[in-house]
Amino acid sequence: MKNRKKLLFILFPLLILLILLGRILCHPSFSTYTSRLFRQELAQDTITLHYTLSDPEAYGFKNMSASLGDFTYASFQKRIQDLKDQQVSLQNFLDQDLSEQDAMTAELLDWWLTGQIEMEDFYYFQEPLGPTLGVQAQLPVLLAEFAFQKEADVDLYLDLLKQLPDYFAQIIDFEREKASHGMFLNGESLDQILAQCNAMLTVDEHHFLITS
């Protein structure tokens, strides 16, 4: 299960580590930039934030509303524009005489931002569902292992549960749109996902969501 959580954040580990380093690097304005980008990325959804930081308030996350994320085209477009804005800001630092460590961080961020922005024309190539790493497989595990360190975490968890119907409704709408473009899941993957969902619905006293 620990490996599953690592796979969920496959795009973020190295990026986040380097951004964290940016908070103590010698160029103060670049440190401010990386800290802002760090917060922007973690603010995408509450579960990512909760699993990454044990004390979010120490990084400027205060009074945030619980969110599983937004799986709509409007949200996708906004994120692409935000990333473009971040890359424009980053160009100012790439042209400066940064320290070796700052320069390496800036180059990595530029590479990552470019890759994310290039997805702009490939919205329907996204696939939130999958037999192993799909949302329907990952989310129950993440919720089962959600850490409760303080009372506020309980409220946060309950707020996340309330959002599940709307979140999955967005994913269903997205899959319908993909199907209309002839890009729906292949039959084998679909059968595995449906079998997995049906198994989740077979609840007894040994179900991992209960025993955990």
Descriptions of predicted regions:
Residues 1-6:
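Positively charged n-region of N-terminal signal peptides that target proteins for export
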Residues 7-212:
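N-terminal maturation segment of proteins
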